[in-house]
Amino acid sequence: GYIGASSIAGAQSYGVYAYMKHFALNDQQINQSKLLCTWADEQAIREIYLRPFEISAKVGGCKAVMSSWNYIGNQWAGACNALLNGVLRGEWGFRGMVITDGFHFTDYMDSDIAIRNGCDLMLKNYDVATNHLTDTTSATSVKAMRQACKNIMYTVVNSRVYDPANTVSTPIWRTAMIVVNVLLAVLLVVLEVLTFKSYKKNCLLYTSD
């Protein structure tokens, strides 16, 4: 936990938001996206599985969390209200955004359910059937989307994204080159017009002779 807290704090000192993952009870990689169910009692969960995350959240001050594919008992960790809102935000005081692990072609990973239970972002580099909201008009969905946006923006604005050092201004030499190129282009057009007029005039003189 303290290793994770130090890594997160170090990254955040440079304006990087580091994802604490995989939250939680992600105890095996084999078949991890195939409805893997991890069973444990509350004492084991709190004292063994959650303790490193708790230290990373409280001591490291993390502002971004990635949930896991697995189920905790019979509930997907990425849409577990007791875990994401109850423990993470409620008990530990976490402020920031939660993103899913990578969306696969699995029916149980549903964004409409996830966003209502404390998950803010769905991780996928291309569109699948369930990684976007299908309900965007109901009162519960609008409320959940508003909260998710707030969580995401809180994380982003507390990173280096809006640091003045990121502002990129055009170097003087580049501005000078642009001006020179424009002037040369104008000069080239003028010369072409004059050349054409001279050629046309010479043609008329030759014809009259």
Q: Where do the PLM segments sit?
A:
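Glycoside hydrolase catalytic-domain context in secreted enzymes
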Residues: 1-208
